[in-house]
Amino acid sequence: MSEESRKHDIEEQHIEKWIPLKERKLNQIKSKLNNLKQQQPQQHSQQQENEQNNATATNTNITNTTTTTTTTTTTTTSSNNDNNFEDEKKPIYQQSQSLLDQKFEMIKKQENKTQRELQQGGTIIENDVNSSNNNNNNGEENKIKEEKRLDMEESDILKSLKTFKPLVSVKDRAKDVIYTDSIKTNWRAPRYILERDEKDHQKVRDQLNIITDGEDIPPPITTFKEMKIPKPVIDVLLEKGIKKPSPIQVQGLPVILSGRDMIGIAYTGSGKTLVFTLPMVLFALEEECKLPIIQGEGPFGLILCPSRELARQTYDLVNSFTNALHKNGGHPQLRTLLAIGGIDLREQEHIFKKGVHMIIATPGRLLDLLNKKKINFKLCKYLGLDEADRLIDLGFEDDIRSVLDNFTNQRQTLLFSATMPKKIQEFARSALVLPVEVNVGRAGAANLNVTQEVEFVKPEAKIVYLLECLQKTPPPVLIFCENKKDVDDIYEYLLLKQVEAVSIHGDKSQDERESAIKAFREGKKDVLVATDVASKGLDFPEIQHVINFDMPREIENYIHRIGRTGRRGNKGVATTFINKNNTESLLLDLKYLLIEAKQKVPPALLEIPDDNQYLQKLQDRNGNTGGGADDDDTKPCEYCDGRGHRLVNCPKLKKQAGPKRDFFGSGGGDW
């Protein structure tokens, strides 16, 4: 709305407010004039009688020496009064001029008084309009000033974040090495696909909601056969129910097989793990066929994961490919090392003696092996970071740098996650060469296959209400808790209620954690109770229901949690308990996610006041039902990608700006 139209609306409102007042004034004046016409003869007669009485009293007190004069005056006055009284009784056109002049003067005075009142009212209206305009202008100016202040503060924060060293090895920085070309591979897309027009390639991307960014992007390919994937691997995928590539695989696999560095962003359960594991297996197989490795050599490829469970899951997937290639394809047996805490190194000595082709690891155990000279990266040219935003976060930056310092040659670097804020993407690009970004859906968006149900539950009623929620869907069900104590309490409560349940958290041994996950996957147990250690990347295809016993401290953990259901195109339900203990910033982030995913927003979230322009536009446009909006409508937090707060109020940034023990305290056992 323009300033002129807004001012006009304000004037209209004030005029409407003053119209009744002016009407009342005019009605009062008309009433007074009517009364004046009716009362004028009586008032004039009374006035003449009073004057006559006063004159008589005066004449009585005067001495008799003027008797003749007094008598004459009294007679004259009486005669005039009688004439006026008689004149008043006549019709107005027969009244004397003096009486008409008196009435005219009276009416004129009333009209002048009315005009003064109306002028005064108009002045008040104008003053009120000007005052309102001034107040509104002051409010707009204050809002603009506050917006500029926040922008400047956020700019200072971003500048301080950009002072971090690039994500490259010490050797490359010391030698001032800058790679300008990506690694060359022998893989090529089929000729008929390469000969297609770029418009045809973009049409495929648009149909699958694939957004790409980069130079000379390889074409998307919609079948595994056209990607030249070996038949034994395709058979393994068919056994897992994967008949055709998912959107992230359609574009991601050709990019990586071409040797390009890549940032992959897609919702949970979209098949990201396959994108960076399968090319590594094919690359290691090609290198082994060229020149077999011997003791002390290897690996050719490395994948880093944020948790033991995710590393174990990735390791199992890689082994399924290598075993199929060896047994059904007649290819050499590739050896993969799982380097995570809780595994006795003596059990893995036979792998070190023969040489390692690939390593799946968590940073802590990997650094331990490097320090003990068990492995080296002289031949390693392939690095994948799963859940990359976690691995590159402030608390883990030094671990990643220490790993990179052991690389001696150029490598192909891949970063994948469901949540990767813009700031983390920019920081990660310092480790990439001519990267291609492949994005399926907005970074940090929830899986649209998941129905999100958010309920306000008092803390003391949560554990009892949990049993009712378990009845929504058949098993298996996954329950997430923020604290290890809550995991143990819920596990014991479910056992008392005769529910087949298992639990995992960071304090349990590796054997306990692996046996619990195995029993849950095999269907021997109906419920798995876990901390966020089970929320990152773990694949449970049959899960229909995820229950968040409490909200995580960061919204991105919520996205990872609910992503354990609704995988591989299936539908799922996520129930989340909220209460007054949750921070307003976190609840606003949740409110945004629900609106964006077209989910029902509970009254408890609708009542939270906020000045987020993006949320207000979404609500105005879609009636609180969601429905997407351009990212340009507002700026998300550039540190965590949350939309319910700004960078200056980012809870994650404040948390990680504190002592390191704050963020090493939870989940540190996985490192």
Swiss-Prot record:
Name it: Probable ATP-dependent RNA helicase ddx41
What CDD domains does this protein's entry cite?
Answer: DEADc_DDX41 (cd17951), SF2_C_DEAD (cd18787)
Q: Name one GO cellular component term.
A: spliceosomal complex
**Motif, Q motif: chain positions:** 222-250
Which residue intervals define the domain Helicase C-terminal in the entry?
Answer: 449-609
Where does the record place a coiled coil? 19-43, 100-154
Q: Give binding positions for ATP.
A: A266, Y267, T268, G269, S270, G271, K272, T273
- Primary localization class, coarse: nucleus
What keywords sit in the KW lines?
ATP-binding, Coiled coil, Helicase, Hydrolase, Metal-binding, Nucleotide-binding, Nucleus, RNA-binding, Zinc, Zinc-finger
Point to the regions of Low complexity compositional bias.
Answer: 33-83, 125-139
The protein's organism comes out as Dictyostelium discoideum (Social amoeba)
Gene this protein is translated from: ddx41
Does the record bear Protein biosynthesis in its keywords? no
Q: Where in the cell is it found?
A: Nucleus
Pfam assignment, any one: Helicase_C
Zinc fingers, CCHC-type, are found at 635-652
Q: Which PROSITE patterns match?
A: HELICASE_ATP_BIND_1, HELICASE_CTER, Q_MOTIF
Q: Which InterPro entries does the record associate with it?
A: DEAD/DEAH_box_helicase_dom, DEADc_DDX41, Helicase_ATP-bd, Helicase_C-like, P-loop_NTPase, RNA_helicase_DEAD_Q_motif
Residue stretches making up the Helicase ATP-binding domain: 253-438
What family does this belong to? Answer: Belongs to the DEAD box helicase family. DDX41 subfamily.
Recorded catalytic reaction(s): these are: ATP + H2O = ADP + phosphate + H(+)
Q: Which molecular function term from Gene Ontology is one that the record holds?
A: RNA helicase activity
